[in-house]
């Protein structure tokens, strides 16, 4: 059967703000470890935004205290303020809005550095330093090349001969070594063409690439 190799783990990573890219630490094909730094944005504007929002939040907290004290509550213990009264006081003081803006600014700062979510290989990295980050598309993709799987189909009348765990041999059409694997998933649905989708885990030692066309033989 004809099949295609796909990575079991794949993550499209993107920046959440369009600041200028300051540093790129990796390139396509590099192997990275979970938690490894991939790229940074210029953080000057983000730092200013975070500092300003933090100041605004502190000011709103003081305003909130003034509102509650003005209503006769003790500044030493606001735990006795009724929930509805506290809700209205937070709106009047601008506390909730200031807190929301601070949390957003804090998140933007935390996401100004891209980190590898798992061990894998870098792919589809085309951005360059000193250019604004494009938030509408992925900055790069991390592929878990150790955990590859072959997606293929079999005829419905062949389904009775396939079981979970059955051995398979994967041969790339591009040539080279054949690799062994085992059936890991059988989709319990026959499509309009009388075909059933099957997946097989492949132990390729990093020698197969996602998207490769292969021939799959079930043993």
Model regions: which residues?
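Low-complexity, intrinsically disordered
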Residues: 145, 164-180, 206
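Amphipathic alpha-helical coiled-coil segments and their boundaries
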Residues: 39, 46, 50-53, 70, ...
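Surface-exposed patches in structured soluble domains
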Residues: 4, 22-25, 31-37, 108, ...
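Extended amphipathic alpha-helical segments
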Residues: 1, 48, 52-63, 86-115
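Structural microfeature recognizing short secondary-structure transition sites
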Residues: 123-124, 178-219
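Short, charged beta-turn/beta-strand-edge "cap" motif at the junction between a beta-strand
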Residues: 45-46, 173-177, 219
